[in-house]
Amino acid sequence: MTELWRLSATDVAHLVKTRKVSAREVAEAALQRLDAVNPHINAIVDCRPDVVRDHADQIDSVLARGDEVGPLAGVPVTIKINTDQVGFATTEGSRLQENLIAKSNSPVVDNLLRSGAVLLGRSNSPTFALRWFTSNLLYGGTHTKNPRDPQLTPGGSTGGGAAAVTAGIGHIALGTDIGGSVRYPAYACGVHGLRPSLGRVPFYNASLPEATIGGQVMHVVGPIARTVADLRISLSAMSVSDPRDPWSVPAPLDGPPMQLRAALCLRPAGKHVVPEVEASVLDAGRRLADAGWVVEEVDDTPPLNESAEVNEWLWLADGFEQLASAAEREGDPGALAVVAFAKPRTKTYLADAVASALVQRATVVRQWQLFLNKYAVMVIPVSAELPFPDQLDLQGDAAFQRVWDSQFLLRATPALGLPILAVSTGLVGQTPVGVQIIAGRFREDLCLRAGEAIEARGTPPAPIDPYTSP
């Protein structure tokens, strides 16, 4: 049999539910894989084998009684360090929160446990989830490495989760996204990541203060995985509505039939992208056309400059001073670089900036919804560049500005509240590349259908051994 850690989550769940393998066997394989490769990439910062084995044994006990288990039966899943999990610190990569032990699970963690998942460990993140690179001072000052190439960023802020999935440490990673933190790590590591619609997956951290307005409107939780099918089953597991999240909506996972029509935009909002990224979008379009989709290249998207402005308003005008103060007390170079870049921009925002942003958001979202009533999906680049050299944002003001500008399409989209899938289209040499697929609100099914068509006509990501210098 193929080594268990190499299998898809879908295949693992089937084997466990049919009792061809035990959840304990899967857990032991995952722990062995973690021990073998995690020292090379620092993806998982807190793993407690006894807890992992206990989760697995509970699944096996349920099956032994003849009872039903959920869609993720026995599947090892990693949890990001900014998400409440009972008995673990919700550190957000900060020494200030090293002892902030969660007394209850976030709703999405409860959903994963009810689905039969085995929680393998806590994945690394930059301090306060502020960067598209993954390092912090809390965990020994080391940073997470991209398994494909340690010279490239693994992405952020769910860099640990994406690196783990890529290296076969677990089958699914739970991530969060307010500015690309699920989508960019998936892109950088050459796997897939889904940013669900606002309200699709419930989230709440009882260990932390109430979220700011920007966080409530733009922050979502989603999965990273090696196959689109695994994103599909993990989304179904995560999406059970929960009253602790006021934005949570019990929406159906599948919407009404719609013509399979995709809009392709190579340079949204007129932004320059490198030729390799443009070629990836065209390649995705060809694969969709081959799968029977009607594909049309369009000159531009509905408003993105205005949506990016909303994102920035909501981030800088609400709670930024508290965040800046925490970053200064923490002293993390990456967090301080973000604060130094952003602080001068806060002076442009008036007292009513949040209200103005929410008014503008309504106009922008309306135009996107009307567009996506005509097209099932929109396909655009993830980033203007291939994955960055690691820690590029710490190389001075010009380098930070380059990163900020290149990530426009990740920053501009969260305020829309729409589902967005980052799907890998393959490699340029040994460097990952991919596209974003956007659909109407609660139409993750259309994102996933398009993603499956693209994946099926390429080479689906498979777990790899981390790259090490010869």
Identify the function of each model-found stretch.
Residues 19, 30, 74, 114, ...:
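Glycine-rich, small-residue loops and helix-cap segments
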Residues 52-60, 116-117, 126:
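Long amphipathic alpha-helix in the N-terminal Rossmann-like dinucleotide-binding domain
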